[in-house]
């Protein structure tokens, strides 16, 4: 059986003052994941499976009802990082039964799981005018960081408040942060394959120096065409048009004429791996 331990939280180059972190330690075993976790908790991913899933699996992941055919991907459901995050969050309530517990965002994008946490009196940080109101958090409160992680500024705020951090950030996400940090130290611009408003991408961008976020191949093709002066598909975008298109998806002071000379690629882990690889290949062919 695993147990929860209170340990210093790594700073990940954010400058945090080592707030406390509730983590899991297992008694042994192996896993193909970066961090093996075995926890006995109230969370069971099987609860979220339905009869329709069973039917699809029994019929080669495809079934037809009337004139509608439904196909199921062979890799589906909660990934191990999600299982891990929810298990740690559930265990946190057991570890701190009388403490006030907050969470900075939805633990995962699943209404049933999030409702269960609300029933366990895990409260959302309130948002006003698009800004999180961390003033509701008091010294000594417990704050859960979700599977997607949290931005550097949020971690610094919580560190200064001397709260107890329950860090459920997926290890695959922290690997991306480490890559982005290397880009920053090497004075590379990070091209992030993701959605600029997604919590994970917001967190990843906060670890970057210069960055631009592209959602798909169309957007990265636009970027490459700008770099090549319209030679790729003839769009011949102006600097003004470029900045208008990516006004919510670039770092402060971003200059496409200067900041796209040397770049590295990172991704939001929920994006398609194959598309990220295609984006990286296109950039390497057109930029160098």
Go through each PLM region and give its residues.
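The feature marks the mature, well-folded catalytic cores of soluble enzymes
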Residues: 2-11, 17-288
């Amino acid at each position: 059986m695993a147990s929860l331990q209170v340990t210093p939280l790594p700073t990940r180059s954010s400058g945090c003052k080592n707030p406390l972190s509730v983590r899991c330690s297992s008694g042994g075993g192996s896993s193909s994941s970066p961090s093996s976790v075995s926890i006995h908790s109230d969370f069971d991913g099987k609860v979220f499976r339905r009869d329709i899933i069973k039917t699809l699996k029994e019929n080669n992941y495809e079934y037809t009802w009337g004139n509608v055919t439904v196909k199921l991907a062979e890799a589906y459901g909660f990934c191990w990082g999600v299982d891990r995050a929810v298990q740690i969050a559930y265990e946190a309530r057991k570890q701190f039964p009388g403490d006030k517990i907050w969470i900075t965002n939805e633990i995962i994008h699943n209404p049933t799981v999030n409702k269960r946490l609300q029933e366990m009196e895990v409260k959302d940080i309130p948002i006003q005018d698009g800004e999180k109101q961390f003033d509701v958090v008091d010294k000594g409160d417990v704050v859960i960081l979700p599977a997607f992680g949290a931005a550097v500024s949020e971690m610094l705020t919580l560190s200064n408040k001397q709260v107890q951090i329950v860090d459920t950030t997926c290890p695959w996400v922290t690997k991306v942060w480490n890559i982005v940090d290397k880009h920053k130290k090497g004075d590379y611009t990070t091209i992030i394959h993701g959605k600029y408003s997604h919590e994970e991408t917001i967190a990843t961008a906060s670890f970057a120096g210069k960055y631009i976020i592209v959602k798909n191949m169309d957007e990265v093709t636009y970027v490459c065409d700008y770099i090549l002066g319209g030679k790729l598909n003839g769009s011949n975008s102006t600097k003004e048009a470029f900045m208008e298109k990516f006004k919510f998806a670039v770092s402060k002071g971003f200059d496409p004429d200067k900041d796209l000379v040397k770049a590295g690629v990172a991704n939001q882990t929920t994006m398609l791996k194959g598309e990220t690889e295609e984006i990286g290949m296109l950039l390497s062919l057109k930029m160098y």
